[in-house]
Amino acid sequence: MYKTTRLQSVLIQYKWPLFLCLFIPCVYGADDNESWTSVSFEKKLPYSLKLEFEQELRLADQVSTFKQTFSELSLSYKVFDGLSLQIPYRYSTYKDKVKQRLSIGGSYKYSFKPLSLKYRARIQRTFEKNETPEDLIRNKCTIEYKLNKSIKPYVSGELSHSYNEDPVQLDEYRISFGLKVDIMENSSIKIFYIFKKEDLPKSDPDEIGVFGLAYSLKM
């Protein structure tokens, strides 16, 4: 029993540094590195509704220049424990353009402590002046491990593709890992890294690494 407990302790202590080593080739192999920092607020409403607001800043060109900032407002409805529906609206400002995005989606989370699995599906349409609206379907799977009461490491994968093309072609994929830390009863921070490959139909898709920090407050 003691040996088993000790082995688990060693695995917990070293598995994430080892996991980080697996992602080092992704960091150095990326065409560009970006940073994403965000602040979000969450408020529960009557009738199983929830309102969320997020403000994010993104830097590109090896984290040296402004890429975009966006404000996102999302309304979600809890169908039952684990299942919810969401309608997010995003207003994004770039150097030379503005984009608006409307989405509808749902997510389901299943927990079997200390692990939890979450699947999210979303249909989104992006609007830009003088451009044809862009439609995408996004599918994301996340595995989260509850290390203790306040620390939850996770890994996730996401695929995006157009739903009005035949045959269907993947547009982008993302692989990420991170750490969510509850710093107070109603607030948390998330530190993460994302490796994403964009414009997959191109002969030479863009490979981008993202270092991120997010702060969340439940009101």
Report each predicted region and the residues it spans.
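Transmembrane beta-strands of outer-membrane beta-barrel pores
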Residues: 55-61, 89-95, 110-112, 123-127, ...
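Start-of-domain marker
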Residues: 29-86
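Predominantly the C-terminal beta-signal and adjacent terminal strand-loop region
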Residues: 155, 166-219
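Residues on the lipid-exposed face of transmembrane beta-strands in outer-membrane beta-barrel proteins
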Residues: 39-43, 73-77, 104-108, 139-145, ...
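Residues that define the transmembrane beta-barrel architecture of outer-membrane proteins
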Residues: 33-35, 67-71, 98-102, 133-137, ...
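Hydrophobic h-region of N-terminal signal peptides that target proteins for export
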Residues: 21-28
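Repeated loop/turn-to-beta-strand initiation elements of outer-membrane beta-barrel proteins
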Residues: 47-53, 81-87, 113-117, 149-153, ...
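Detector for outer-membrane/organellar transmembrane beta-barrel domains
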Residues: 44, 107-110, 114-161
